[in-house]
Structures are given as structure tokens and as C-alpha cells.
Amino acid sequence: MQIPVKLYTLSTCSHCKATKQFLDNCSVKYDFDDLDLLNAEERNRILEEVKKLNKDCTFPTIVIGDKVIVGFKEKEINEALGL
């Protein structure tokens, strides 16, 4: 069974795009929210989730299982995924 992967991203963020591309290249399925494309109500709700995981609320915020990774860090992502 695959570890659940959730990304909190911005559509214009180069590190967010690199993270998605990396996961796609590794054939990893993931859910994501591009916060800047959400309506205000949804964005505010999800920002509260992000703040609980990453108090600085920076992007990408990546949740792999129970591990939170802030930023595009290939080595940490690989380790969390067991790749």
C-alpha cells in the first residue's frame, strides 16, 4: 500500500512545480491544493491546516504519511517514501 502524500502548494511557485514533477517522475500518487487558486473561504480553511504543520506557512509543505517536509528536499522526500 502506498504511503499517503499530500502537497500544499502555490501554482506559481517554482519549488512547488519541481516537487510535483519529481513525484510524477517517481510515479508517486499525491493529492495537492494550489492555495492561490482556491476561493477565499477554502484558502483560509486550508491555510489553518498548513499553519498546524508548518508555522511559517511556506510552500511547498509536503505531508508523507506522518512526516512533514517543508520545501523541495529530494533526499528527505525519497527517505519518507522509502525510495
Model-derived features: positions:
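Local sequence-structure signature of Cys/Sec-based thiol-disulfide redox active-site neighborhoods
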Residues: 1-33
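Nucleotide phosphate-binding site architecture
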Residues: 14, 36, 70
